[in-house]
Regions:
Chain A
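N-terminal helix-turn-helix
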Residues: 2-94, 254-262
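Amphipathic alpha-helical regulatory segments at dimerization interfaces
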Residues: 27, 43, 94-106, 112, ...
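Juxtadomain coupling helices with adjacent low-complexity linkers
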Residues: 195, 206, 223-274
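Short, solvent-exposed recognition segments
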Residues: 2-4, 132-206, 274
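Sensor-regulatory modules in signal-transduction proteins
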Residues: 215-218
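Amphipathic alpha-helical effector-binding/dimerization core
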Residues: 69-169
DNA sequence: GCATGTGTTCGACTATATCGAACACTGTTT
DNA sequence: AAACAGTGTTCGATATAGTCGAACACATGC
């Protein structure tokens, strides 16, 4: 009955049923199609009755929906609302709105803001390139950290231990140019750390590049990154990084970092009701 | 504290701790700022230790984050990812992408697609008006059903019992023109049902109007709605609804409904691997 | 310095979640 | 037709696993 804690991590008390419920949610979210009770039970190693009870409870909360025809389950609408609520409460995102807008118009490129989540970068804000082209919204998407400039910018300023674990955790290639060797990646992170800016040249999507810089809080931790994405021809013309964009990104990240740091140091909880 | 199940639905067993965990998440999502353990415990009527255990478990799953400085809790990044996963699995949204795009360019207005969630309409897709103006993305937002055309369009075709409960559940005014009287609202729903299209004229935001039509699945249930939003001057010039937009919305909703119905009737699970 | 606040820990109690087998139902196979 | 292999669902016995409440350590403000 006892689930052994994997690789002898610190054994903190966790509530079993809630953990299982969370894993069900992630399971439904990961696989891109609806699952049945038996499939859920199998994949999590639970009794069918147990999985059913959990699903029923989640359904009552509208975190999960059941297709009335097939009886299978999928994520529910409350999930979207909570996801949105996360964004509303997100400090980095809130503070980045104005900076991202101005960076987008100044650089005439799309802007993304991301934070580290596991070994991926989670996009928390996205401003479209200011032209009429059709673009898809990427907020909520997650990108392997080593395949985007945002991720490298964050990783470069992480405490050693954390950076190590990132480097060691399965680096999968997305394009032919994705760097997956930990050693060379570590070197490039050192370069990023001295330059203060990270680059990505078709390592995630062929034809697209990114220039990004880290964002720090008042403790000096890299809590996220902001950068511009766009076609290689414009970001890296003739193999050289556009100096204009580079300066714009750097200055924006500094301004945003100042915002983040100042918010905590100067006044403790200015927005809270007294 | 107890939400009465609409029309006396059967009360089944639910797992206590999971339900409590879900309520914690909603609490963190609703109040727009981070909460402490004691506050959570108070608002849910739990022992402090219990609330702590739940929060710890949710934190381990990254559904909740703890501010290392203040010790207070907020929603975590996994929430955003799950919210996004909900969208990816959402059938109506998936099928509406193309229709919404074409409606937006045909009508030169912003397009929204929504579903009913509780007594609100949850926006699951949003196409910006095809001009260069700055617009904010509304996906994930929820709007009181009686204050938007999407909501009226859905409600007009709901089973009697469900429509009743909507009419009876606290209708709050958002602007001076919001209709909050159940009787007059019911009348207007009857009109909507015969016309096949719903209107909204500055009932949610001053200066903005909306034209929407319902979307049906193969069972004939109104599972959502699609419509255009924009300034009153363009949607309702001189007090008359733009005939062009009205036709466009109507035709789009019919096409989308056909998509939704056809997907289920013709082939059972065409997208599933064999 | 005390008084109040916080988040956190711990152990005893029993309410509570888990299991596993049996159920009703559907569509397919024989 | 009838037996089969699936599904989601129900139910009751068992002891596990979650809940409570008091005590803890730490921070803040009087």
């Amino acid at each position: 009955m006892s689930l052994a804690t994997p690789d002898g991590g610190p054994r903190r008390a966790t509530i079993q049923s809630v953990e299982r419920a969370a894993r069900i949610l992630k399971l439904l979210g990961a696989g891109s199609w609806r699952l049945g009770v038996t499939e859920v039970a199998e994949r999590l190693g639970l009794a069918k009755g147990t999985a059913y009870g959990l699903l029923r409870t989640l359904e009552a909360q509208e975190l999960v929906e059941q297709d009335p025809e097939t009886g299978k389950y999928r994520l529910g609408p409350a999930m979207l609302q909570l996801g949105n609520a996360f964004l509303d409460n997100h400090e980095l995102r809130a503070r980045s709105l104005l900076w991202a807008d101005s960076l987008a118009s100044r650089g005439a490129e799309a802007v993304r803001v991301g934070v580290l989540h596991g070994s991926n970068v989670l996009i928390v804000h996205h401003v479209f390139r200011p032209d009429n082209s059709v673009q898809i919204l990427e907020v909520g998407a997650s990108i392997p950290w080593h395949a985007c400039a945002l991720g490298k910018a964050i990783a470069a300023y992480l405490p050693d231990a954390q950076r190590r674990s990132l480097l060691d955790s399965g680096l999968v290639p997305l394009t032919g140019r994705t760097v997956t060797d930990p050693a060379t990646l570590e070197e490039s992170l050192a370069t990023v750390a001295t330059a203060g800016v990270a680059l990505e040249d078709q390592e995630a999507i062929v034809g697209e590049a990114e220039i990004a810089a880290p964002v720090f809080d008042d403790m000096g931790h890299s809590v996220g990154a902001i950068g511009v994405v766009g076609p290689v021809e414009r970001l890296v013309p003739d193999g050289r990084v556009s100096a204009t964009l580079l300066a714009a990104v750097r200055e924006t990240s500094r301004g945003l970092s100042r915002d983040m740091g100042a918010g905590r140091v100067r006044s403790r909880g200015p927005a809270a009701r007294p």
